[in-house]
Amino acid sequence: MKKKYRIIGLAVAALLFLSACGRSQVTSHSSDAWEKFVYFFAETIRFLSINGRIGIGIILFTFLIRTILLPLFNLQLKSGQKMQELQPELKALQTKYPGKDRESRMRMAEESQELYKKYGVNPYASLFPLLIQMPVLWALYQALTRVEFLKTGSFLWMDIGNKDPYFILPVLAAIFTFLSSWLTNKAAKERNGMMITMNIILPIFILLIGFNLASGVALYWVVSNAYQVFQILLLNNPFKIIAERQRLEDEARELEAKKRRAKKKAHKKRK
């Protein structure tokens, strides 16, 4: 788990570093491969813009990206659900190998891998959508700050290439990020401290970063996380999962009670 969050942290740090690189204007004549990619993003957004409304183009572009990545996000949700179900067994392994010596750690890692293999779980599946989205976010940021026809666009109360003057988008991005994390972990049988902490820290991080990002990037974040909230409710609804789990537990208890009653009845007949 710690390694996973370390990878997330490194990916975010890389995005921030790379976002600071490259300030020159990107045009259709740019020869650099990355700048061509950035310009392709810009042209795609312009194509999707209705009546020249760049904000609409960014919203439709976000829907397009999220729809393309839908299978990966679905894999992420299913893998996360299986990981949550595995937590009791993983905790049992931690109890079995409490030592910090190299041999204990190796044995615990080996048995953990066997568990993942047994249940068909990839512990890093949840990182795939994030790692794919990082270059998308970077390219979008570069397009909004280095391509003239996007940089000068406007939508509602904001200039697409500048930060939101009223900070509405960063706040919405943080809210939808929190809802997405909360819904993802809602059905977990057990919640560890790291999970709870990340549910709080990640939205705050998004909020603080969003204050200084171009409004277009913040808009992408809002739409992307709102899309994910509805996706979770549609494909992996935690309330339905909890209700189904409760139903199965009630059925198991009822079955156990019937067995006990049958044993008592049989015992009385023998008497």
From Swiss-Prot:
List GO terms (cellular component aspect): plasma membrane
Lipid-carrying residues in chain (S-diacylglycerol cysteine): C21
Please give the biological process terms from Gene Ontology that the record holds: protein insertion into membrane; protein transport
The source's domain of life comes to: Bacteria
Membrane topology qualifier: Multi-pass membrane protein
A GO MF annotation of the entry reads:
membrane insertase activity
Purpose: Required for the insertion and/or proper folding and/or complex formation of integral membrane proteins into the membrane. Involved in integration of membrane proteins that insert both dependently and independently of the Sec translocase complex, as well as at least some lipoproteins. Partially complements an E.coli yidC depletion experiment.
Q: What is this protein called?
A: Membrane protein insertase YidC 1
Give the organism the record lists.
Answer: Streptococcus mutans serotype c (strain ATCC 700610 / UA159)
